[in-house]
Regions:
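N-terminal targeting signals for export/organelle localization
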Residues: 1-53, 160-163, 174-175, 180
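A short beta-strand-turn-helix
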Residues: 48-69
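Thiol/disulfide oxidoreductase modules built on the thioredoxin-like
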Residues: 131-176
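Structural alpha/beta surface segment adjacent to cysteine/selenocysteine redox centers
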Residues: 112-126, 139-147
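The canonical Cys-X-X-Cys-His
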Residues: 79-83, 152
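Typically the conserved alpha-helix immediately C-terminal to a functionally engaged Cys/Sec
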Residues: 83-96
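Thiol-based oxidoreductase modules, predominantly thioredoxin-like and allied folds used
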Residues: 99-114, 123-133
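Short active-site neighborhood of thiol/selenol oxidoreductases, capturing the structured segment around
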Residues: 64-80
């Protein structure tokens, strides 16, 4: 039985995800609002349609062999300020012809649960999720990290890192993007 509120739910999902395909998908099928929500998340996620594992060895590999420059935002599913910090990163690179990768690393959820949060990170290149013992992974990233999010690491073209809790300052962003 279809509820009289399901058409409204479909419209609300379309507005929340900013995805015209949600409206198209739900037209004539108001009972499919749940599937429409996931379709909108997948479309909004852009390139990040999968979640890569991030274990104790991943950070060293990314620093030695990963793209440069690049940004990594370490976040949790309940971090209310992380999307705003990611928006600062996205705003810093969106006018550039060669955009550095902007990556999100989920610390508390993986797989489809992590992908549900992809819509919060507009412009994200890749999503990772902790895979292993969280304290050991954090230790591998930064032994001084006090387990506070958002935790942002900017890797410049030379492989030098800048680390900050919260959004990076304009000076940090300039230094990150101007390194030869």
């Amino acid at each position: 039985m279809t509820s009289r509120f399901e058409p409204f739910a479909a419209l609300l999902l379309a507005w929340a995800f900013g995805a015209p395909q949600v409206l198209a998908h739900t037209a004539g099928h108001p009972g499919h609002a749940h599937h429409a929500a996931h379709a909108g998340t997948q479309q909004t996620a852009g390139a990040a349609r999968s979640v890569l594992p991030f274990d104790e060895t991943t950070w060293a590999q990314l620093l030695s062999q990963g793209p440069r420059p690049a940004a990594y935002l370490f976040t949790t599913s309940y971090c209310s300020t992380c999307p705003a910090a990611f928006a600062v990163l996205h705003d810093a690179v969106k006018g550039r012809t060669a955009r550095p990768p902007l990556n999100a690393v989920m610390m508390d959820v993986a797989g489809p649960q992590a992908l549900r949060h992809a819509a919060h990170f507009k412009g994200m290149s890749q999503m990772y999720a902790f895979d292993g013992f969280e304290p050991a992974i954090r230790q591998a990233v930064d032994p001084a990290w006090p387990n506070v999010t958002p935790y942002v690491v900017l890797v410049d073209a030379k492989g030098q890192t800048q680390r900050v809790i919260g959004p990076p300052s304009p000076q940090m962003l300039r230094r990150w993007l101007s390194a030869p």
